Amino acid sequence: VKILCQEQGCTFIASRENRGYNAGNNIGLRYAAEKGYEYAFVTNPDMEFPQTDYMAKLIGTMEKDPDIVVIGSDIVTPEGRHQNPLDFLSFWSEFLWPIDLLRCKLTKKTTSSSLDPTISRYCPMLSGCCIGLRIDFLKRLGFFDENVFLYCEEPILAHQVKKAGKKLYYLADTQALHRHIKSTKGNPYKRMSLLCDSRNYKNKYHSDYNAFEQSLLTASHKLRKWIMEILAKQSQKSNKRSKK
């Protein structure tokens, strides 16, 4: 990667450790802030941008409206699924997670609800795989919250924007392609535990839930982790038997 960046005239900043998506992005965002940039774009490495005026349109929209501090485009998968704009996961969907998981499997949708991608508008939340950000807003925040590792970055940022009285904006006439890279996801129990811990943190520090609602969600996530732990142990036993 370092050699490729040198060939393409890009700045490569190595991280000494993997502290998660937000912490990694903050390295680049702080660098951009130090260099005096007004805007920054955070994208996954599996994004493609066939639209030549993509950046110009997004930045132009932010220039016209100073209340917009986060902006996103239409994001489409090779299968034609739209990943923007997004709505928050509701309290009941998070609390009654078995029902929500079943709904997602049947509809093949994510737990965050996708809204109509044909209309440009202010929106509750945007996918973190490709977003434009106003640097001065990030500086006031102290940059991205680094207390989560892999999950809940989008709802945390969306709540911070809402709390600051600013806006997220979805621009429908710009489009990027997300060729999602399928990778080995590792231990499912550890991933579920990480998701539950991230949601508990998000609900405590970056939500409008009261103490009672937070306690209900914490109990629900505790049950979810316990069930996943049992399933993981059963899977390990089954794998050991099959190897004999």
Where are these regions (language model features)?
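Glycine-rich, basic loop-to-helix element that forms the pyrophosphate-binding segment
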Residues: 15-35
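Conserved donor NDP-sugar-binding/catalytic core segment of glycosyltransferases
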Residues: 48-85
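A short, conserved alpha-helix in the catalytic core of glycosyltransferases
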Residues: 116-118, 124-175
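Acidic donor-binding segment of Leloir-type glycosyltransferases
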Residues: 1-17, 27
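Short, flexible, basic/aromatic active-site loop/helix in glycosyltransferases
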Residues: 91-123
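Short beta-strand-to-loop acidic/aromatic patch adjacent to the donor-nucleotide binding site
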Residues: 37-48
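Nucleotide-sugar-dependent glycosyltransferase catalytic core
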Residues: 83, 163, 170, 177-197
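Non-catalytic, C-terminal membrane-associated alpha-helical segments of glycosyltransferases
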Residues: 187-244
